Amino acid sequence: DDLLEAGTVGITGVDTRALARRARGGMRVGVFTGEVGPVSELVQTVRATPDGADTLISRASTSEPYRVGEGEPAVAIIDLGLGRELAETVRRSGAPALVLPASATYADVAASGAARVLLSGGPGNPADATTALGLAREIVSARMPVLGFGLGHQILARALGFATEPLLRAHHGANHPVQARESGHVDITSHTHSYTVDFAGSPDVEITHVSLNDGSAEGFVARGKPVAGLQFHPELGAGPSDAHHLLDSFLKDA
């Protein structure tokens, strides 16, 4: 009744675990509500819907730049879909920021006057995020300090030449334990990703964080370059021991 009153779509009487297993992988799935047409028309609608990361990111990103905090921006945030959440966390940290749309160019970043760049999380397969990947390569080449979260982490890794691949079991939820390899400290973190980076034991990066659930890489720092990534989302602040300190560390000199 509460869902109906709020106009919120819900589902009941369905084995959601079985549904998740069926939909896992590369299957294209459409969810329809209300009055629907013949199945053949629904299938055609799903097939005709663009599913590339560039399309998904552009829909989720801000359409116009906007400022967060007082003063000249110290940080430029590239909004790949979760930019607003990241901007709010940056604001609370006291660092003025300029949030740029996913379509921003390196010239836009340079013109912002910001000394550091954050790549937010967002939707889609990182291998298809060609616009964001091009920007990331320019940022890395210019040696601007940059930190990516979620999709941003994956795109930075690809900009450094690493491959990404689907996880056997996607990470979603607000209770994933992640351990910092150097200190052994464990944070309970928010995850929203279906892909992981294959660092393949490369000497060019240091793996800083790992998942305690499946051992996958959850953070890296590039050796000799001011580039770092976190596969999880400190800005979503899950759990009693959230990971805001990792973002604060990046911002402290901003």
Say what each PLM segment does.
Residues 1-95, 100-103, 107, 112, ...:
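RNA-binding accessory domains that recognize and position tRNA/RNA substrates
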Residues 219-254:
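A glycine-centered loop/beta-turn motif at secondary-structure junctions
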Residues 9, 74, 145-147, 163, ...:
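Proline-centered loop/turn at the N-terminus of a beta-strand
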Residues 78, 100, 167, 210, ...:
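Hydrophobic residues at beta-strand termini and immediately following loops
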Residues 111, 116-194, 239-250:
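Cysteine-nucleophile active-site neighborhood
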Residues 70-75, 183-186, 222-227:
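Beta-strand-turn-beta hairpins that frame and shape the catalytic cleft
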Residues 185-224:
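Catalytic beta-strand/loop cores that center a nucleophilic Ser/Cys/Thr
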